[in-house]
Amino acid sequence: MEFKHISVLLDECIEGLNIKENGIYVDCTLGGAGHSSEILKNLSKEGKLIGIDQDEEALKAASEKLKEYENVLYKHSNFYHIKDILEELEVGKVDGILMDLGVSSYQLDEKSRGFSYMQNAPLDMRMNKKSSLDAYEVVNFYDESKLARIIKDYGEERFAKRISNFIVESRENKKIETTGELVDIIKRAIPAKFRREGPHPAKRTFQAIRIEVNGELEILNKAIEDSVKSLKSGGRIAIITFHSLEDRIVKNKFKELEDPCICPKDFPICTCGKEPLVKIITRKPIDPSKEEVEINPRSRSAKLRIAEKL
């Protein structure tokens, strides 16, 4: 199996991580190992890379791609568990951590995974195939109000109520089994005028269901906090996001870690004792260049934010 994936903001990530040749680095979303491969090129044999992915197929493909390197440790897990993983591996503090929060090109293109609204496939969307919750469960068994909330909150979809209503009405006759069936329902729910404008009409709903299935936003907050605690002083964390919800979480969490003081604004001095943990390197997120977007259109919505441990 070939795990096809074009790494997004590759040069910007490598530069942003400020790699030390003998350092220890963690790729929390190993995927096609594009970023990891570049990190390893910048490491000596004393340096080390830890690659984490919850997708076993991604791990297998990455280990094949990186087989010439002996300084790589692979871990089948979710980066939610980064603190436990590093304790288990007894590596202590690390010099850099990377998170690429996008669905890989392989996962989008592999029909059986059910991530794409462009191909007909079973409703799945699990990053980790061993997870019990899948898209079929969400679409067919969540009640209408819960579905509407997920589509509105996670997909930022203005027609969330109509879409959830159409889904519930459709499944009363027959369970919704494929991505193609779901796309047709979404298209019927969205007024024609709005279907013709902007991105694919199913994009936001599919994003929302994927986030729910994989618990992506709940995981992210804790993972950033634990990652920063796992960094050495001067170590950096670089995070690539692909939609505004994720970017907002990263932006706000970095701000909170840079200025954690909870004292009232009119207090002359801080008495809460909460000290800054990071310095934000990217006041504004780094976007892909026009050239990168032309080569890889999927990079269009990517944003990179970087912070350094104090």
Swiss-Prot record:
Annotated Pfam families: Methyltransf_5
Gene Ontology cellular component list: cytoplasm
Keyword rRNA processing listed: yes
Reaction catalysis annotation: cytidine(1402) in 16S rRNA + S-adenosyl-L-methionine = N(4)-methylcytidine(1402) in 16S rRNA + S-adenosyl-L-homocysteine + H(+)
Subcellular location: Cytoplasm
One GO term of the biological process aspect: rRNA base methylation
EC number: 2.1.1.199
Gene3D superfamilies named in the record: Putative methyltransferase TM0872, insert domain, Vaccinia Virus protein VP39
Record: residues binding S-adenosyl-L-methionine: 33-35, 53, 79, 100, 107
Molecular function in Gene Ontology: rRNA (cytosine-N4-)-methyltransferase activity
Swiss-Prot/TrEMBL keywords: Cytoplasm, Methyltransferase, rRNA processing, S-adenosyl-L-methionine, Transferase
Role description: Specifically methylates the N4 position of cytidine in position 1402 (C1402) of 16S rRNA.
PANTHER family: 12S RRNA N4-METHYLCYTIDINE METHYLTRANSFERASE, S-ADENOSYL-METHYLTRANSFERASE MRAW
HAMAP family to which the protein is assigned, alphabetical: 16SrRNA_methyltr_H
Family: Belongs to the methyltransferase superfamily. RsmH family.
Protein name: Ribosomal RNA small subunit methyltransferase H
Source organism per UniProt: Clostridium tetani (strain Massachusetts / E88)
